[in-house]
From Swiss-Prot:
Disulfide bonds join C108-C118, C136-C145, C259-C370, C284-C329, C477-C506, C515-C533, C521-C568, C525-C541. The modification Phosphoserine is found at S723, S734, S744, S931, S957, S983. It comes from Mus musculus. The modification Phosphothreonine is found at T773. Residues 745-825, 839-876, 919-986, 1021-1073 are annotated as: Disordered. Residues 514-569 form the PSI domain. Glycans are attached at N51, N283, N435, N461, N631. Keywords: Cell membrane, Developmental protein, Differentiation, Disulfide bond, Glycoprotein, Membrane, Neurogenesis, Phosphoprotein, Signal, Transmembrane, Transmembrane helix. Belongs to the semaphorin family. One of its GO terms (biological process) is negative regulation of smooth muscle cell migration. This is Semaphorin-6D. It is found in: Cell membrane. GO terms for molecular function: receptor ligand activity; semaphorin receptor binding.
């Protein structure tokens, strides 16, 4: 139980962590209001309907003062009485007209501006008090300001220059407000918009401004809002981030602060400039290992109280050259104040990075403080500040830390759409208890989003997208460009339950809720989660207001639980509701049964509109969105069971059941444990099978290894000795391993004469002469044996020829043998079976011949074949080591001759008798390279041919490289004196790699000709000739003396070469052949 509880805790922490670091997904709206429904909302265009001759509105700003809405545009200011509820069109009650003079327009045209720009666009409309309002306009690029009476909009007073109070161009942004009788404005102060300024004018005292052309203070700003709070005035804007100039041009959102009692600096420092100007970054980002920032501030609200905390809420977007993305972030004023009390940021050199300033380097009083308040309480005015403080604030206006959002994350994000959010308005007291916060956000596409905000970090629910409203009306508003669809501003009229959405050419009034759409469908009303709507006891869904009794309505804003409610099939909406048509269709994951909805296939109009405007909603229920369309009012009568003005939901019986969170977590845990168990069993079974397979493979490898001979005991049939032959040095000491083969079980003395070991008392060669040696035993690869079946007939003919022409057994020397009792060669030559053929010795012949010989040498029974095979392998390996010991010049011949009988028994050798009729089972390797001459007798035994110590030809490069010592005991290879053994014209041939070798090479120039038995032999004087094999040789292959090429194999003494029996040849030395 404790483990299960611990597991649940860990799972909860992991889920919380994932929710914190994962990028939020876009929510689908619970309700959608498209153009067909929103087109009924009243629109303000600045001119009466049908009068298209008047100019467009060119909306600039909108301000609500008490029960009047002021709309400023080009050359005019309109007033709208909010107490009058419009039906189809918003009619202004009053209008202020202020046009530019003719001279100003002509001057504007002379400056190169278009005539449409040379008008008076009202950019400033700020109340001075309850009676007067301060109005400024661009006045054809010559800004001017006036005072007007607020109630009558009559001109009062004289014109004032609008320089540094109003921009020159209507496309430039600006903000302004009165605080303590002084006008605080932020705009550009020149025609080219290069001098951005935050300016204070009017009232007592001198005018103050920011430092001109100082990028550390302001760099290409875009001012959005100004508010008064406490002893300060705050400006919200975006600008080019000066701290990231080295990394590129990036836009950051800023909040700047100045003291209302700032009087400027002394005559030495910051005279007529702000002494309290500070700015900090607004950080609106998605948390995680790598933050995703929304850096561009688009709009921000006034200070509102959210959960008792003074807060500003803004909408932020990504950079202009980035992917579209928007977020809504809230910042508390306390967090902003905290940042301004933090550390400063500085750049020591123009090329260095920006770093934080240590606290010990900050002068006293602290820069940014207001005189007579806080740390600067001892100073009456800012003029009295020390020069160190003024100099520091002049070069360090930027704070090091950024202002974090509430809960360190956005309230709402929108990233899966192609538009950005541009305007924001907040109702902080929504619902009958005024305890909900609803955010209205405008976008570039003319869509207004209605969001139920998550205002507490401990809230269990995230922000919910309640509605998506298409507020733009292309039929009544200008549609000249995509910019006309952009929402410029939003104004909330909570008293009259309305929201004014401003576009460049019109203003649309939309209600805050559409409770009448749900009609008498309780399930749709509750599922909407709209804090403005509730289900009344009268059986209708209507707007709930403050003061209604709790028992008089029902709503579920937190969860929208409708599991206990049935489907909607009841009555029709009130008669005051306009006609509707079907919009959309069932969601993508459900299908509407024919019994639930009756469709009319003969109505192409409804089909086209459904396809064009349908937006899928990924929910588990089937939903329809209904909206107004006067042209199809008769069509809705043909659809049975669909009430007008009702968002009708048809759900299956299974979807009404909800699963409790504990049950869901338990199921997930059980599934995880079961999956882990199954995975463990699968891994165990797989591992067991894999281990068994490896053991079987290992066992097969060992058995295959035991069936093979030593490295020098088989012939390579597929390549005819591709690699150079191993050669062994004569003076290698014999190991002590062979002492057990002797009768006396003692090692031979090192000075024992080995020559006497080779001859018995009858003068015959030793019986060991018939045994194969490592030098004369080729390597047989068994993998190529099956590929040589094509030569089986040759193998049979080869066996028959050997029966007809038996060979001499080496135990009795031939008549012309030069051997004597006192002399025996140090290497013993075996008869070569390949001399019996006139054709080339193929691989298959060798293989089958050896199989036949093996069957003759080992006539064992089937029952003991495996045991005898292993013993045979061990005997051959031991024999190889013994023969190495026999070749040792320091061996004792008497001890070896005395142990011949025991060696025969130990090595499991066959009697010598059968071998007199059958040749040795292993052919001579050197002799197999040649085809014997046709003139030689078949039965002639092979002879030992010794090479003299001093060769008759120059030493080869291989011999020079190996550095052999010249002594009488050294034996040279026959390849030192090449002899033609098979070529009819006596030419020395070099065997080169060839895929189709069938000819002879001509005699090379510069060759020395010798004669062996009357046949001219070409002796090549070059260092060496290569010997290669052929895979496709046909017919009789020429055999010739060979020369070895240098190789990378270890240095070993050369082995003797063997040739068929010939007549005696006397070279330059004393040896007899």
């Amino acid at each position: 139980m404790g483990f299960l509880l611990l597991w649940f805790c860990v799972l909860f922490l992991l889920v919380s962590r994932l929710r914190a670091v994962s990028f939020p997904e876009d929510d689908e709206p619970l309700n959608t209001v498209d153009y067909h429904y929103s087109r009924q909302y009243p629109v303000f265009r600045g001119r009466p309907s049908g009068n298209e001759s008047q100019h467009r509105l060119d909306f600039q700003l909108m301000l609500k003062i008490r029960d009047t809405l002021y709309i400023a545009g080009r050359d005019q200011v309109y007033t709208v009485n909010l107490n009058e509820i419009p039906q189809t069109e918003v009619i202004p009650s009053k209008k202020l007209t202020w046009r530019s003079r003719q001279q100003d327009r002509e001057n504007c045209a002379m400056k190169g501006k278009h005539k449409d720009e040379c008008h008076n666009f009202i950019k400033v409309f700020v109340p001075r008090n309850d009676e007067m309002v301060f109005v400024c306009g661009t006045n054809a690029f010559n800004p001017m300001c006036r005072y007007y009476r607020l109630r009558t909009l009559e001109y009062d007073g004289e014109e004032i220059s609008g320089l540094a109070r109003c921009p020159f161009d209507a496309r430039q942004t600006n903000v302004a407000l009165f605080a303590d009788g002084k006008l605080y404005s932020a705009t550009v102060a020149d025609f080219l918009a290069s001098d951005a300024v935050i300016y204070r004018s009017m009232g007592d005292g001198s005018a103050l401004r920011t430092i001109k052309y100082d990028s550390k203070w302001i760099k290409e700003p875009h001012f959005l809002h100004a508010i008064e709070y406490g002893n300060y005035v705050y400006f919200f804007f975006r600008e080019i981030a000066v701290e990231h100039n080295n990394l590129g041009k990036a836009v950051y959102s800023r909040v700047a602060r100045i003291c209302k009692n700032d009087m400027g600096g002394s005559q030495r420092v910051l005279e007529k400039h702000w002494t309290s100007f500070l700015k900090a970054r607004l950080n609106c980002s998605v948390p995680g290992d790598s933050f995703f920032y929304f850096d561009v501030l688009q709009s921000i609200t006034d200070i509102i109280q959210i959960n008792g905390i003074p807060t500003v809420v803004g909408v932020f977007t990504t950079q202009l050259n980035s992917i579209p993305g928007s977020a809504v972030c809230a910042f508390s004023m306390d967090d902003i104040e905290k940042v301004f009390k933090g550390r400063f940021k500085e750049q020591k050199t123009p090329d260095s990075v920006w770093t934080a300033v240590p606290e010990d380097k900050v002068p006293k009083p602290r820069p940014g403080c207001c005189a007579k308040h806080g740390l600067a309480e001892a100073y009456k005015t800012s003029i009295d500040f020390p020069d160190d403080t003024l100099a520091f604030i002049k070069s360090h206006p930027l704070m090091d830390s950024a202002v974090p959002p509430i809960a360190d994350e956005p309230w709402f994000t929108k990233t899966r759409v192609r538009y950005r959010l541009t305007a924001i308005e907040v109702d902080r007291s929504a619902g009958p208890y005024q305890n909900y916060t609803v955010i209205f956000v405008g976008s570039e596409a003319g869509v207004v989003l209605k969001v139920l905000a998550k205002t507490s970090p401990f809230s269990l629910n995230d922000s919910v997208l309640l509605e998506e409203i298409e507020a733009y009306n292309p039929a009544k508003c200008s549609a000249e460009s995509e910019e006309d669809r952009k929402v410029v501003s939003l104004q909330l009229d909570k008293d009259h339950h309305a929201l004014y959405v401003a576009f460049s050419s019109c203003v649309v009034r939309i209600p805050l809720s559409r409770c009448e759409r749900y009609g008498s469908c309780k399930k749709s009303c509750i599922a909407s989660r709209d804090p403005y709507c509730g289900w009344l006891s009268q059986g209708v869904c209507e707007r709930v207001t403050l003061g209604m009794l709790p028992g008089g309505y029902e709503q579920d804003t937190e969860y929208g639980n409708t599991a206990h409610l049935g489907d909607c099939h009841e009555s029709l909406p009130p008669s005051t509701t306009p006609d509707y048509k079907i919009f959309g269709g069932p969601t993508s994951d459900m299908e509407v049964s024919s019994s639930s909805v009756t469709t009319v296939a003969s109505s192409p109009e409804i089909t086209s509109k459904v396809i064009d405007t349908w937006r899928p909603k990924l929910t588990s229920s089937r939903k329809f969105v209904v909206q107004d369309d006067p042209n199809t009012s008769d069509f809705t009568d043909t659809i049975s069971g669909i009430p007008k003005g009702v968002r009708w939901e048809v759900q299956s019986g299974e979807s009404n059941q909800m699963v409790h969170m504990n049950v869901l977590i338990t199921c997930v845990f059980a599934a995880f444990v079961l999956g882990a168990f199954i995975a463990g069993v699968a891994v165990y079974c797989y591992r067991d099978m894999f281990v068994r397979k490896n053991r079987k493979i290992h066992k097969d490898a060992e058995s295959a290894q035991s069936c093979t001979d030593s490295s020098g005991s088989f012939a390579k049939l597929n390549g005819l000795f591709d690699s150079p032959v191993k050669e062994y040095q004569q003076n290698i000491d014999s190991p002590k391993l062979y002492s057990n083969l002797l009768t006396s079980r003692k090692e031979l003395p090192p000075n024992t004469d080995t020559k006497s070991m080779a001859v018995d008392h009858r003068g015959q060669p030793p019986e060991l002469a018939a045994l194969p040696t490592p030098e004369s035993t080729p390597v047989l690869h068994q993998k190529t044996l099956q590929a040589m079946k094509s030569h089986s007939e040759k193998a049979h003919s080869h066996g028959a020829s050997r029966k007809e022409h038996p060979q001499f057994f080496p135990s009795s020397p031939p008549p012309h043998s030069p051997l004597s009792h006192g002399h025996i060669p140090s290497a013993i030559v075996l008869p070569n079976a390949t001399h019996d053929y006139n054709t080339s010795f193929s691989n298959s012949n060798a293989h089958k011949a050896e199989k036949k010989l093996q069957s003759m040498d080992h006539p064992l029974t089937k029952s003991s074949s495996k045991r005898e095979h292993r013993r045979s392998v061990d005997s051959r390996n031991t024999l190889n080591d013994l023969l190495k010991h026999l070749n040792d010049p320091n061996s004792n011949p008497k001890a070896i001759l005395g142990e011949i009988h025991m060696a025969h028994q130990t090595l499991m050798l066959d009697p010598v008798g059968p071998m007199a009729e059958v040749p040795p089972k292993v052919p001579n390797r050197e002799a197999s390279l040649y085809s014997p001459p046709s003139t030689l007798p078949r039965n002639s035994p092979t002879k030992r041919v010794d090479v003299p110590t001093t060769p008759g030809v120059p030493m080869t490069s291989l011999e020079r490289q190996r550095g052999y010592h010249k002594n009488s005991s050294q034996r040279h290879s026959i390849s030192a004196v090449p002899k033609n053994l098979n070529s009819p014209n006596g030419v020395l041939l070099s065997r080169q790699p060839s895929m189709n070798r069938g000819g002879y090479m001509p005699t090379p120039t510069g060759a020395k000709v010798d004669y062996i038995q009357g046949t001219p032999v070409s002796v090549h004087l070059q260092p060496s000739l290569s010997r290669q094999s052929s895979y496709t040789s046909n017919g009789t292959l020429p055999r010739t003396g060979l020369k070895r090429t240098p190789s990378l194999k270890p240095d070993v003494p050369p082995k003797p070469s063997f040739v068929p029996q010939t007549t005696s040849v006397r070279p330059l030395n004393k040896y007899t052949y």
